């Protein structure tokens, strides 16, 4: 009870302290103050004091509201902001693990040997066999009975077939004579026919007479 009474008394003293400077002014001064603050000028002294007092109360409330608005607000949900980098690190770790697994599978697939009909195929490098030239080959020893080794016989065969490899064999000549061009054949035919006509032209009338006589003779039998 005592605390409530003290609070009421303090509020009344505050109101009286706010009202005391306005109450000490004259009516003309109050009208000037109301005019400067945009309030009504008409009325009694008590009404003017109330208007000025209410204006001070509203101004004080507005100032409190502005102070509250201008104050920086504390950040909310601090725990969530702290959790975000942890989640991002976890995602990065997962991506690294997935990439490493994919790389392992790719290397394993590349290491495996190709299969044909479910059988492994082993690739081996191609070996080029180089035979030594014939001139540098050593001749084997000849037997006392006059028989040479098969290596010498093969050498003789190679030496005999060398000229034919350069295009001097009879088979190649025959192939060249048989494979005449069409224009060459036409030229040969025309030349032979012209020569025969030129040779047999003086004897042509007698030859024609003989042909006609033989034809008449055959008709006589028919």
Swiss-Prot record:
Keywords: Membrane, Mitochondrion, Transit peptide, Transmembrane, Transmembrane helix. Residues 22-56 form the SAP domain. Pfam families: SAP. SMART domains: SAP (SM00513). Residues 136-150 have a biased composition (Basic and acidic residues). PROSITE patterns: SAP. The chain crosses the membrane at residues 186-202. It comes from the Eukaryota. GO terms for cellular component: mitochondrial membrane. Residues 1-12 form a transit peptide. It is found in: Mitochondrion membrane. Residues 65-85, 131-150 are annotated as: Disordered. This is Altered inheritance of mitochondria protein 34, mitochondrial. It comes from Zygosaccharomyces rouxii (strain ATCC 2623 / CBS 732 / NBRC 1130 / NCYC 568 / NRRL Y-229).
């Amino acid at each position: 009870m005592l605390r409530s009474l003290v609070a009421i008394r303090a509020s009344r003293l505050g109101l009286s302290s706010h009202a005391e400077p306005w109450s000490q002014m004259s009516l003309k001064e109050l009208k000037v103050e109301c005019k400067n603050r945009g309030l009504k000028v008409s009325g009694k002294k008590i009404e003017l004091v109330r208007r000025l007092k209410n204006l001070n109360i509203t101004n004080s409330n507005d100032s409190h509201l502005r102070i509250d608005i201008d104050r920086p607000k504390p950040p909310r949900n601090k725990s969530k902001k702290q959790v975000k980098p942890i989640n991002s690190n976890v995602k990065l770790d997962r991506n690294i693990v997935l990439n490493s697994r994919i790389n392992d599978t790719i290397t394993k697939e590349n290491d495996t040997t190709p299969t044909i009909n479910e059988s492994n195929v082993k690739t081996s490098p191609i070996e080029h066999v180089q035979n030594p030239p014939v001139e540098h080959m050593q001749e084997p020893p000849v037997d006392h009975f006059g028989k040479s080794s098969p290596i010498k016989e093969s050498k003789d065969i190679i030496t005999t077939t060398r000229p034919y490899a350069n295009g001097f064999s009879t088979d190649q000549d025959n192939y060249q004579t048989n494979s005449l061009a069409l224009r060459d054949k036409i030229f040969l035919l025309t030349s032979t026919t012209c020569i025969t006509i030129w040779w047999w032209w003086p004897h042509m009338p007698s030859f024609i007479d003989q042909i006609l006589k033989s034809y008449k003779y055959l008709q006589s039998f028919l």
